[in-house]
Curated annotation (Swiss-Prot):
It catalyses: alpha-D-glucosamine 1-phosphate + acetyl-CoA = N-acetyl-alpha-D-glucosamine 1-phosphate + CoA + H(+); N-acetyl-alpha-D-glucosamine 1-phosphate + UTP + H(+) = UDP-N-acetyl-alpha-D-glucosamine + diphosphate. Gene3D superfamilies: Hexapeptide repeat proteins, Spore Coat Polysaccharide Biosynthesis Protein SpsA, Chain A. Residues 227-247 are annotated as: Linker. This is Bifunctional protein GlmU. Keywords: Acyltransferase, Cell shape, Cell wall biogenesis/degradation, Cytoplasm, Magnesium, Metal-binding, Multifunctional enzyme, Nucleotidyltransferase, Peptidoglycan synthesis, Repeat, Transferase.
């Protein structure tokens, strides 16, 4: 059996944030959510989150995670003290305990799996993850033989000059035999500079300790401040971009674009500079996005082009052109072959196949049929000050420039709305509707004061 415990009780003072450190966002998910996800493939029998600082807020944020047990550490008195809190709740448990840190979000699932499998095959009481760092300053040094058996872990401040030449460091991630760990946890001492109980001290107390060296040191980067958060964001973004480039996506300027792990791209997609993807996005084959574009929780079909625009919580069909400077807001549904032009906003509206809104328009709470042509400056006036109302425009209808459709109103099929009209009543199919003041011209007006 396997239990996974995530240490998430720390305050994160150096973040200088009202938000607990483990709830800081990284590529669309919190740090601790990423840590939990990294161990998901192991299918542990128990998952425990050790909480402390703002425990209630952390629990509320993660209440959607099925089967997650919360264990309170109060006060926060070190990593060893944190794991001591598991003693009563894991009484009678038989198996391994994997200990992860809630602020180390870049661990790959394959690395964690290798740690657990290596621990099981070695017969060790504890196996710890290690990394060789170019600059190990501040990290505890791990001393081990060529077979991987650990003899000692010495904190940086306690190392001699010779010992500091060893760049094999402790990543703070462990796989224990729970029964062996449970015996030594009560023996931990706080006789150290910080007056805390260190989980590291259990390694020397257990008969057999092994280590597994991680191939990529970036995996064990911890986050204590905003700079480190940004560095980890950069590593994760590069992983995502590399993956999708290997899958047939072109990033013209990769470093200027950001993704979420819930993005899905078809083949031969081209992403121009300064284009960003948030949340769950689906992009069809042969689409071209950007530059200067945001796609947020949206679904785009094949051969879609979006230029310098925002598409948020919207659905876009095949062969659609959007932008520049268009804004598709939540519940916009744009059909096959549509055109959304410059300075157009669409909200909670559907556009049938082939419809066009080319310039300077607001389409809100509306249903447009197929092959509708919306003239420049057309507005659906959907709000009466209290409630929103719907505008319906039938197939093959067109509105003249600078028209206002005052909802609720229904425009039939094959209707023409004259330019400059304000339409307040329904218009039957095949009609021409003009609702504007009659033009009046007064000759010699300029001479009136002479």
């Amino acid at each position: 059996m396997l239990a996974v415990a995530v240490l998430a009780a720390g305050k994160g003072t150096r973040m200088k944030s009202a938000l607990p450190k483990v709830l800081q966002p990284l590529a669309g998910a919190t740090l601790v959510e990423r840590v939990l996800a990294s161990a998901k493939n192991l299918q542990p029998e128990r998952r425990l989150l050790i909480v402390g600082h703002q425990a209630e807020r952390v629990e509320q944020t993660l209440e959607h995670v099925n089967g997650l047990e919360f264990v309170l550490q109060s006060p926060q008195n070190g990593t060893g003290h944190a794991v001591q809190q598991l003693l009563p709740v894991m009484e009678g448990f038989e198996g391994e305990l994997l200990v992860l840190n809630g602020d180390v979000p870049l661990l790959r699932a394959a690395t964690i799996d290798a740690l657990v499998q290596g621990h099981r095959s070695s017969g060790a009481d504890v196996t710890l993850l290690t990394a060789r760092l170019a600059d190990p300053t501040g990290y505890g040094r791990v001393f081990a033989d060529t077979d991987g058996q650990v003899s000692n872990i010495i904190e940086h401040r306690d190392c001699s000059e010779e010992q500091r030449g060893n760049n094999l460091t402790n990543a703070g991630i462990y796989c224990f035999n729970w029964a062996a760990l449970a015996e030594v946890l009560p023996q931990l001492s706080n006789d150290n500079d910080q007056g805390e109980l260190y989980l590291t001290d259990t390694v020397a107390m257990l008969p057999r300790a092994m280590h597994l060296e991680v191939d990529d040191p970036d995996e064990v980067n911890g986050i204590n401040n905003r700079k480190q958060l940004a560095q980890c964001e950069g590593v994760l973004q590069q992983r995502l971009r590399d993956y999708w480039m290997d899958e047939g996506v072109t990033f013209v300027d990769p470093a200027s674009c950001t993704l979420s792990e819930d993005c899905r791209f078809g083949r031969d997609v081209v992403v121009e500079p300064q284009t960003h993807f948030r949340g769950c996005c689906s992009i069809g084959d042969n689409s071209k996005l950007g530059p200067g574009t945001l796609i947020d929780n949206a679904s785009l079909g094949d051969r879609v082009e979006v230029v310098q625009s925002v598409v948020r919580e919207a659905k876009v069909g095949d062969d659609v052109s959007i932008g520049p400077f268009a804004h598709l807001r939540p519940a916009a549904d744009v059909g096959h072959g549509c055109r959304i032009g410059n300075f157009v906003e669409v909200k909670k509206s559907s556009l049938g196949a082939g419809s066009k809104v080319n310039h300077l328009s607001y389409i809100g709470d509306a249903s447009l049929g197929e092959n509708v042509n919306v003239g420049a400056g057309t507005i659906t006036a959907n709000y009466d000050g209290v409630n929103k109302h719907q505008t319906v425009i039938g197939d093959h209808s067109k509105t003249g420039a600078n028209s206002v459709l005052v909802a609720p109103v229904t425009i039939g099929d094959h209707v023409t709305i004259g330019a400059g009209s304000t339409i307040t009543k329904d218009v039957p199919s095949k009609a021409l509707s003009i609702g504007r003041a009659r033009q009046m011209t007064k000759d010699n007006w300029a001479n009136r004061s002479i």
